[in-house]
Amino acid sequence: MKVFDVHKFDMKKEQDFLQVQFNLKNRINLSPTIHPDSINTCAGVDLAYWEQDGEPYGVCCIIVIDADTKEVIEKVHSMGRISVPYVSGFLAFRELPLIIEAAKKLETEPDVFLFDGNGYLHYNHMGVATHAAFFLGKPTIGIAKTYLKIKGCDFVTPEIEVGAYTDIIIDGEVYGRALRTRRDVKPIFLSCGNYIDLDSSYQITMSLINQESRLPIPVRLADLETHVLRTFYQKNHV
């Protein structure tokens, strides 16, 4: 799959991270560029981390499924040492090198990517799902398991029914949704990544839910695969 060269990752200072985020923020597109019914393939993206000889390592897995049958079409991964330091609010800079490396291995071009992480629901609207879209050139969706509290704003818990949601509104702007994907199971936190609107993100996400998890199928599969791969690399000291 073709990946665009948007910026380098040799930055170390928070000020440099922030400048990149603000430059890209002006190019975020939350219009409906894709219709949920037109999707044939979708990908889930997740990462896992560990330490080896005092150095941080990570593995990224991308799993592509058929949107109709939910069968796995392709899976790829990348592994390596993490060179970008962790700074709160700038996690994407740490994760993107492995995401890009894995995406380049894809023979399939997914119609949409779903990330285990935030997108527009972020301090600067630049969570990993949003940031990654500039490199991937595809619509992206953020699926977070825990709530990122911004400007002290809490979310309103949705009703218990499947598909119930409440908009997450901060300073009068909708950042995302608290979404109940399974009855009586705690919600996930949905946000647009890029090149997609919130209603389409909602429809796509709900179409990928089954009884096994509150997470969309490709995200859950990617999550499981990263844990398997992390265990493998830890045991083999690769």
Curated annotation (Swiss-Prot):
Q: What is this protein called?
A: Endonuclease V
Which family is it part of? Answer: Belongs to the endonuclease V family.
Top-level taxon of origin: Bacteria
**Keywords, comma-separated and alphabetical:** Cytoplasm, DNA damage, DNA repair, Endonuclease, Hydrolase, Magnesium, Metal-binding, Nuclease
Taxonomic lineage = Bacteria, Bacillati, Bacillota, Bacilli, Bacillales
- What are the coiled-coil residue ranges? none
Q: Which cofactor does it need?
A: Mg(2+)
Q: Name one GO cellular component term.
A: cytoplasm
InterPro entries to which the protein is assigned, alphabetical: Endonuclease-V
Feature type site, description Interaction with target DNA: 86
Which species expresses this protein natively? Bacillus subtilis (strain 168)
